[in-house]
């Protein structure tokens, strides 16, 4: 009966994980289809991006499962292991977790190092002209993409071989590489060291991206929701554009009347002025059409109702932005508290990656998770929300900063405008960032919760030799396992999570990674603070130039059909006819989209 109770509890945890993975799949689908361009899609790129994001999120969502499983083996109220949690059962749980972790990380590595590069080169090798001429076939395109992918894999293998041989280089100076040497490497567990080197290197690269993109997005995402209402409503934009268009055409009539009846040609000054007015007129005509569509003209009743519903519920968006803003500040404070605590109180400092035995200062995020873990799956839901928030912040950061090489912007991410190459590169960047998010959650945001969950141990001495301590009458002697670093009574009760053990192994084996990852958190906090203060001070402005450029891009792509487009507006959009329209390219920066090279309306 006791054993079946333990099996039921662990099974429910895995069922909750399966449900989370199913939801993650829908999140990945929505993310990919929201950001990719609709007129330049590749089925292979779309599929690879969706599968990759699902696998990456499934990997990071395994952390709360890890925490819940090790927590389920102990009784927090008694400070002892549960009756069903025998060493064999605990070993089986940890072994299952390790298998799932290694499987997911191996699959992630396969996607990021093989599948995504192949999809990238496959798309790059496509040439419509050669295809029409019959000089490009599926096989030639496949082999070209495979050739570049193999070259990329060779570089990666060289890097991992370095990680395999370096661990024992200091102990084996001057020895030749023979079969005994390989055997010694394997028996000394250096294969796992090589794996920890590879993951540590990728995690460190991810931390660098995490500092730039996640910190930026964490500051901008809540502020963008709060400031989502534009500086001008759709009716105001329509009226302003109509007035400018009428003034433009009046100036054209004046020039034409001034030159009417003249035998000689129009002067160069008048010709230049007229050409300038004609170009401006085309821009205003496009903008007027956008404003009309934004006001709901020509749209179905359902779309008009949907637009007004958005306007009515806009205060909820504002309220959600304020809540996320508070959450961002709390996360920042919690990370700062833990980082300072580690820097000041870690016994081994940089020699062990600033591992801390227990938290010395109250840390709000860790406290919330420890309390919520007593009522599973509340902590799982909170952790899922936290991960999705950091994930969304990373996307916002990548969209704001762009994909850059040094200071040169290579690709720009925009909703509905992201090229397939940018989508794949952003997916790899997210993979690296997710590794960094794992590190931040385990080591800074919720170190006690992520390492031991709700496990506690009893400090009371047992009266019977060999019997477990009994704290039923001594509740004051029950301590959290985060304080078990030097207590011998905790070794039989406190089971660390698989993820925390693996991350600690990385920073212990490769202290340089631990030092970089830790001090990079202060850079993260600094970047967040700078972007946060700047975004609060800077007021959003209506960028008509960007609107016109996006409208021109849409029209050149032939996207003239009216689909809904978000026009955040104010109360005038409720009383007027605010509309989401044009080209299916939502954009949170104001009005816009559609059109270019549209012909001027007849005068």
UniProtKB/Swiss-Prot annotation:
Residues 585-595 have a biased composition (Gly residues). One of its GO terms (biological process) is protein localization to vacuole. One of its GO terms (cellular component) is vacuolar membrane. It is a multi-pass membrane protein. The keyword Mitochondrion does not apply. Glycans are attached at residues 509, 543, 597. Residues 578-603 are annotated as: Disordered. One of its GO terms (molecular function) is cobalamin binding. The chain crosses the membrane at residues 13-33, 50-70, 99-119, 150-170, 201-221, 318-338, 353-373, 381-401, 422-442, 512-532. Keywords: Cobalamin, Cobalt, Glycoprotein, Lysosome, Membrane, Transmembrane, Transmembrane helix, Transport. It is found in: Lysosome membrane. InterPro entries: LMBD1_LysCbl_Transport, LMBR1-like_membr_prot. Belongs to the LIMR family. LMBRD1 subfamily. Probable lysosomal cobalamin transporter. Required to export cobalamin from lysosomes allowing its conversion to cofactors. PANTHER family: LYSOSOMAL COBALAMIN TRANSPORT ESCORT PROTEIN LMBD1, LYSOSOMAL COBALAMIN TRANSPORTER-RELATED. This is Probable lysosomal cobalamin transporter.
